[in-house]
Amino acid sequence: IHGCVLCQGESPLVYMEDVGRHNAVDKIAGWMFLEGVGAADKLLYTTGRLTSEMVIKTAKMGIPVLVSRSGFTAWGVDLARQLGMTLIGRMKGKRFLVLAGQERVVWDADPAAVAEEPRGHRRKGSVEDDAA
């Protein structure tokens, strides 16, 4: 099952899910159309991969920011950059990769603030890996 959430600022507006990632996005598009909801100030979060097709679909909806917990394709990233979209991948907890359009991202004002690692989690290339 794939899910999508349409957000305005930090507030979720609607959640849709489907067995297909594209279908979940289509349900969001349909809801926006039926409710007369504008897209310019919205963010779309999806559980699906950030492929070129997902970027094109989101761009056609007029949504400037596309976020996923999943991975991405090089073509999807290139298209997002060409279209002036913000693309964020691998979002889990407070960690994420800004792949395109980082000028829209408001970074934490406290440089000392760091996300807590999940218990037992070790990242590749971490200091602990080098010491082993």
Describe these PLM feature segments.
Residues 55, 60-132:
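Conserved catalytic-core subdomain
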Residues 1-49, 53-56:
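Conserved mixed alpha/beta catalytic, RNA-binding, or beta-rich assembly cores of soluble enzyme
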